[in-house]
């Protein structure tokens, strides 16, 4: 009886708004009734352990905003082979005091071409190469015991062309053809092409693919084997919601909703950031708050800062709990290569101007490339040529520019537009790989300093940090992908290599490269234990009076923590005279911010005395 009352109480809170939004979007009472039945069934199927977690999280809604949050992302197979073996590696994760683990897509996918798992064949089943649903459930249970929340991708925009819905559509089933955007001729597709940008103009040109089995054109925003779902069909929303609830009941606590700005299609638009996207995300948020309030939504929104606030919704009607901080990641790498933090500061100022409910997952590298989506209007105001700057950056991180320390590769280079993205691990892009090849210990020291500088700046930002697995031991590029015919065409595989367990053994040996990074990550965790990393802390940039130095300030009550980050290879002065008073370092040294001297690539953290 108590369980029924709990569900009824949560549902009553959202019933009117959920039903209003669903009917406004779909005008389909039958679909709404199916959705509400699925919600009740998912709640009833939820384990007592997970329901207890729901209660705990409801009592502490800011749990993911606390300073102890520290994340990592990885591919299951590259780290451990499969889910069972990954569970055996938990001591390594616990050693790092992780609280958040994002496993790259692990649901059933076609092989070998699956866009790194983002072409999903079955949203309810773990891919057999990685294990079973029981293995996933066992892993989430062990992670919870260790205080680690599991994040999985939920690919909302599309399915694999081999998904059972797509296979039924190919066989002529009109019901499932309506799950996608299918057209008999090019009339409507050509109208879409006039306004919809191409994601991969070179490797996957156009937004439509001819399906010979159906004799129809199907919308494929990304690759030809990824069919865009038709969210104008209420059955699609209901079925996808059913799947996310199923995964939540296996113990998944965070969902990274992939490519969410793309999910609604409308002729005459770019099919990006449309109002109906927010209706769908808001409905999904309410469903989760009713059935499994412990679960958090993390949006993947690769858009300008001005577009981001909408994806958080409002405090009264929230959508995503947090977003990937793509823009700052790009600007951190840009500042390092340019030795100029002005663009980074401007971008951070735009983020800091967002409402208080906006929260970010900060990172340097992940499974994807670095796309140089810098703010061209700000670049021009600063006297920077946007195109030349972009070309400089991707050539620099390719290692194909005089004086570059980096080793990487280009991704999706387009000679017609001069556009390209960058691939490589953090360590290799910071110069570790090149220094080791040359046997240059001075260059290696600088490379490690760059690596730690970026990580420290990233961990200081509003939100919480997420490491890319291997960064904690300075893992290098995996050039052997070029010998694999199934992987050679995608240069992102350069930074998708097997975890080097032999190198990991060196992490506790003083004087090793691995220990330098390992200890550096430990210092970040100590830094974030400060009360200035509480959810209600105020974060802002400050004028350092030196374009090569980024200044960040965290303040909570009477406590103030200042971070100064020298993005150059030279000693650099900074002056923050408006921040008066005496400051001290962690080891007790006194610093006066009116006149500070920083060493090359130094990250200086000082607390107001």
Set out the residue ranges of the language-model regions.
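Active-site and adjacent substrate-binding regions of carbohydrate-active enzymes
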Residues: 1-579, 587-588, 592-609
């Amino acid at each position: 009886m108590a369980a029924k009352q709990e569900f009824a109480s949560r549902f009553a809170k959202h019933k009117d708004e959920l039903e209003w939004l669903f009917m406004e979007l779909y005008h389909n009472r039958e679909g709404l009734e199916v959705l509400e039945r699925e919600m009740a069934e998912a709640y009833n199927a939820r384990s007592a352990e997970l329901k207890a977690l729901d209660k705990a999280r409801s009592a502490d809604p800011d749990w993911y905003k606390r300073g102890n949050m520290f994340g990592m992302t990885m591919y299951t197979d590259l780290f451990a082979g499969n889910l069972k073996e990954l569970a055996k590696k938990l001591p390594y994760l616990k050693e790092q005091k992780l609280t958040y683990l994002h496993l790259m897509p692990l649901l059933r996918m076609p092989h070998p071409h699956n866009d790194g798992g983002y072409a999903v064949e079955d949203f309810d089943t773990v891919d057999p190469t990685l294990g079973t649903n029981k293995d996933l459930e066992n892993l989430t249970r062990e992670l919870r015991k260790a205080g680690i929340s599991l994040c999985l991708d939920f690919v909302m925009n599309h399915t694999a062309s081999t998904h059972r819905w797509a296979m039924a559509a190919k066989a002529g089933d009109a019901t499932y053809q309506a799950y996608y955007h299918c057209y008999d001729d090019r009339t409507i597709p050509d109208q879409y092409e006039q306004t919809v940008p191409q994601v991969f103009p070179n490797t996957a040109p156009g937004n439509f693919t001819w399906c010979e089995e159906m004799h129809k054109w199907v919308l494929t925003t990304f690759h030809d084997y990824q069919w865009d779902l038709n969210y104008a069909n209420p059955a699609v929303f209901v079925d996808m919601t059913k799947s996310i609830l199923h995964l939540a009941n296996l113990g998944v606590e965070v969902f990274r909703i992939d490519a969410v700005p793309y999910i609604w299609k409308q002729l005459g638009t770019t099919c990006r950031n449309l109002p109906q996207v927010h209706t769908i995300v808001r409905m999904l948020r309410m469903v989760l708050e009713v059935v499994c309030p412990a679960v958090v939504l993390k949006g993947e929104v690769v858009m300008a800062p001005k577009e981001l606030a909408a994806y958080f919704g409002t405090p009264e009607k929230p959508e995503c709990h947090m977003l990937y901080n793509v823009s700052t990641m790009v600007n951190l790498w840009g500042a390092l290569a340019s030795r100029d933090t002005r663009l980074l500061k401007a971008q951070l100022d735009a983020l800091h101007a967002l409402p208080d409910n906006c929260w970010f997952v900060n990172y340097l590298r992940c499974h994807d490339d670095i796309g140089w989506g810098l703010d061209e209007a700000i670049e021009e105001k600063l006297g920077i040529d946007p195109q030349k700057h972009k070309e400089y950056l991707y050539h620099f991180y390719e290692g194909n520019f005089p004086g570059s320390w980096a080793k990487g590769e280009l991704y999706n280079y387009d000679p017609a537009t001069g556009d390209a993205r960058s691939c490589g691990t953090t360590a290799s892009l910071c110069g570790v790989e090149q220094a080791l090849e040359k046997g240059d210990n001075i260059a290696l020291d600088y490379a490690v300093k760059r690596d730690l500088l970026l990580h420290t700046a990233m961990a200081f930002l509003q939100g919480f940090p997420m490491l890319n697995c291997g960064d904690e031991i300075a893992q290098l590029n995996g050039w052997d992908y070029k010998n694999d015919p199934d992987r050679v065409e995608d240069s992102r595989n350069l930074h998708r290599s097997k975890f080097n367990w032999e190198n990991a053994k060196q992490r506790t040996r003083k004087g090793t490269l691995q220990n330098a990074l390992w200890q550096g990550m430990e210092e970040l965790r100590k830094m974030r234990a400060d009360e200035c990393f509480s959810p209600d802390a105020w974060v802002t940039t400050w004028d350092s009076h030196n374009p090569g130095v980024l200044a960040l300030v965290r303040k909570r009550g009477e406590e103030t923590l200042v971070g100064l980050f020298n993005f150059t290879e030279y000693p650099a002065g900074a002056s923050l005279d408006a921040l008066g008073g005496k400051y001290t370092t962690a080891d007790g040294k006194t610093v006066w911010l009116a006149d500070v001297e920083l060493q090359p690539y130094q990250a200086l953290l000082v607390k107001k005395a």
